[in-house]
């Protein structure tokens, strides 16, 4: 999918393993880390039983796209999830339960416009 952020500091991500009765779920969040336009993909445990940011499980720093357009690709084999931003910047995490539960695209501040959403199964 493509996400167009409304501002330089928009924070958004994808949540996985979101069932109707879960007290915690996992998210890969594109987070503005510094005022100079650098971003990082953070791994967070959200929900009422979640821990929030999981220290030591975050991604590498990458530059904010000048036009605030993020082309996001997510691949999974049902236990390992890899997220790519603009075909270059990636993050991989083992997350069990992705094949049995709902996913969501979230915006935590600002706004995002989603387009080109495509799902493929092999």
Question: What are these regions, as identified by a protein language model?
Answer:
Residues 1-122:
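Beta-rich accessory regions
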């Amino acid at each position: 999918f493509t996400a167009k952020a409304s501002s330089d500091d928009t924070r958004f991500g994808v949540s996985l393993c979101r069932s109707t009765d879960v007290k915690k779920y996992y998210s890969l969040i594109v987070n503005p880390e510094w005022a100079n336009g650098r971003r990082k993909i953070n791994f967070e445990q959200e929900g009422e039983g979640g821990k929030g940011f999981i220290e030591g499980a975050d991604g590498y720093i990458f530059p904010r796209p000048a036009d605030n357009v993020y082309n996001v690709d997510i691949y999974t084999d049902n236990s390992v999830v890899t997220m790519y931003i603009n075909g270059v910047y990636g993050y991989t995490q083992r997350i069990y339960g992705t094949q049995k539960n709902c996913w969501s695209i979230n915006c935590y501040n600002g706004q995002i416009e989603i387009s080109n959403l495509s799902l493929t199964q092999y």
